[in-house]
Regions:
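Loop-helix junctions at membrane interfaces
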Residues: 1-150
Length: 150
């Protein structure tokens, strides 16, 4: 990767991150379905338009910006699992559509990406994070709760 292509990649990725933050802020008062759909649209568009690495970068930082804007999970411990779900979505779209953006590839990526993102979120949050947090002794849970309330 030469210098100009690195600069182009950084600029394109920054534009998608800025678009993502703007959409999250604008749709904050709307339903989570609207905000989540817009975020997924930006992730997929970043992957298809700017490449796999750009999509992965936007997918990884998206939930942290959502947390800072008060949109995403209320507990910071859940944010990495949302990032994992986003990364899974980008991986599916990147792998299935890398040979070309054809309708059958896009429909397949849409279905498989949604299912695998659900599996990643469900297994990460419901099966791992919440039981782990609930298993903490009372004093540790109180300290963590106080940290999360800040």
């Amino acid at each position: 990767m030469n210098r100009n292509s690195k600069i182009k990649w950084i600029a394109e990725t920054a534009i998608f991150i800025a678009l993502l933050i703007t959409l999250q802020a604008v749709t904050k008062s709307m339903s989570q379905f609207v905000t989540g759909s817009m975020v997924n649209l930006v992730l997929i568009t970043a992957t298809l338009a700017s490449g796999f690495a750009s999509g992965l970068t936007v997918a990884a930082v998206s939930p942290f910006f959502a947390f800072m804007l008060g949109i995403g999970p209320k507990f910071i411990a859940l944010v990495p699992f949302v990032a994992l779900g986003n990364i899974v979505l980008v991986l599916v779209w990147g792998l299935l559509c890398k040979k070309g953006v054809e309708m059958k590839n896009m429909i397949t990526a849409l279905i498989i990406g949604a299912l695998l993102k659900f599996v990643a979120l469900y297994s990460g949050i419901v099966k791992f994070a919440i039981p782990t947090l609930l298993a903490l002794p009372e004093k540790q849970a109180a300290v963590m709760g106080a940290n999360f309330s800040l």
